[in-house]
Design a protein with these regions (language model features):
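Aromatic-capped interface at the extracytoplasmic side
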Residues: 39-53
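Hydrophobic membrane-insertion alpha-helices, especially the h-region
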Residues: 25-43
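Soluble "head" domains of membrane/secretory-pathway proteins
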Residues: 2-22, 46-49, 57-269
Length: 269
């Protein structure tokens, strides 16, 4: 009933690929993908897994955040500290959420923090309130419904405030009381970076940021290890800016995977 399709005269039938040829094709495909992804992640875009709560409530543990590595310039791929730049066309600004290398362990540890002061700025903390160039930030308590939209109710009520400066407005976690926490190392030794024994996490400064440097802090002011501990960060050590959370999940006991759907593709203020 059905006739086989006749091959045109002179057409040579295709030889079947051997197992080795098939493997080689896969190897070539993976090599090409690797060759594209390495410079892409090294110089253009990347992601960062957030392990701690120092940026709560803006960024929480389990978030995977997008990193724009072209925000301030084009970086040589696969270089760490000191970062090597092909060219730079911008600098971090107040309010930027950035990824930078830790001055305490610059060879492998990256941090996510917020830039609160840039070169030439004078910064001070008075009873936990941020003061930039003599102007104190405004703080507005957030009501219960707004807090639930931010964190899903995971941190409790009335711990957040909206911190507003001339450049930016974002939620921060305020200390639960007005006590001062001395800046101490493990073992009770005072941090010698600033050599000011009267300074604390909530009463700090004033300090003037040198040109080409930035002062960074976590939005969770009472549990962030930041420039109050390790000092200024050179602008060239800021890897990129983070504009958004891509997705969020935590591996809990069991093991059980907790997916935070409401945090997917959330903009970072």
């Amino acid at each position: 009933m059905f006739k086989r399709k006749q091959k045109p005269d002179g057409e040579v039938p295709k030889a079947k690929k051997t197992f080795v040829q098939g493997v080689l094709e896969w190897v070539k495909a993976f090599a090409f993908a690797f060759a594209v992804m390495v410079p892409l992640r090294g110089s253009i875009i990347d992601w960062f897994d957030v392990p701690s709560g120092s940026m709560e409530p803006t960024i929480v543990p389990g978030d995977r955040i997008f990193v724009n590595k072209l925000a301030y310039g084009l970086r040589v791929p696969l270089t760490k500290e000191p970062c090597r730049w092909i060219t730079r066309w911008g600098s971090p600004e107040r309010g930027d959420v950035v990824i930078c290398y830790s001055p305490e362990a610059p060879d492998h540890i990256r941090l996510v923090k917020r830039v609160v002061a840039v070169g030439g700025d004078t910064l001070e903390l008075r009873a936990g309130k941020l003061v930039i160039n003599g102007t104190e930030a405004a703080y507005e308590p957030l009501d219960e419904e707004v807090q639930k939209q931010i964190d899903g109710g995971r941190f409790g009520i009335m711990r957040f405030a909206l911190e507003t400066t001339d450049d930016n407005a974002h939620p921060v976690v305020r200390a639960p009381n007005d006590r001062d926490v001395l800046i101490m190392e493990r073992g009770g030794q005072f941090i010698s970076q600033w050599k000011e024994p009267a300074w604390t996490l909530s009463n700090f400064g004033p300090v003037t940021v040198p040109a080409g440097k930035v002062f960074v802090m976590g939005d969770s002011r009472d549990k962030s290890r930041d420039s109050r501990f390790f000092g200024f960060i050179d602008e060239t050590q800021v890897v990129g800016r983070s504009p958004a959370v891509v997705f969020s999940f935590l591996l809990q006991r069991g093991p059980r995977l907790s997916i935070e759907w409401d945090r997917f593709f959330r903009a970072i203020p």
